[in-house]
């Protein structure tokens, strides 16, 4: 069997790992073994945080909407209930954007949601 010389491939592999680890602190950017291990962790963190980012943004939108509707004298869950009853199908992202950048339009949406709510808080919604 012929001998396989891997020097070129090995150097290329190590160089790419060290290039990807550029910017890490200490040995993690200079030593191949440490850099490789850190890259594996980094890929896992990256994957996990890409999933978590979606929930983080949803929480942020809910907080922004909650602050804006409380200034109008209604709670967040009553506002969402009013939107459903009024047939307004705006997602939380759009509502948060309106609350921050266009308060007048958001105020009219809140008024429509308030109008759609039943007067009695404990009244059944379907009645």
Swiss-Prot record:
GO cellular component: ribonucleoprotein complex; ribosome
Gene Ontology MF: a single term: structural constituent of ribosome
Superkingdom in the source lineage: Bacteria
Keyword rRNA-binding: yes
InterPro entries with a match to the protein in the record: Ribosomal_bL20 (IPR005813), RIBOSOMAL_L20_CS (IPR049946), Ribosomal_protein_bL20_C (IPR035566)
Keyword annotations of the record: Ribonucleoprotein, Ribosomal protein, RNA-binding, rRNA-binding
GO biological process, one term: translation
Similarity-based family: Belongs to the bacterial ribosomal protein bL20 family.
Function: Binds directly to 23S ribosomal RNA and is necessary for the in vitro assembly process of the 50S ribosomal subunit. It is not involved in the protein synthesizing functions of that subunit.
Xref: HAMAP family: Ribosomal_bL20 (MF_00382)
Protein name as annotated: Large ribosomal subunit protein bL20
Taxonomic source organism: Bifidobacterium animalis subsp. lactis (strain AD011)
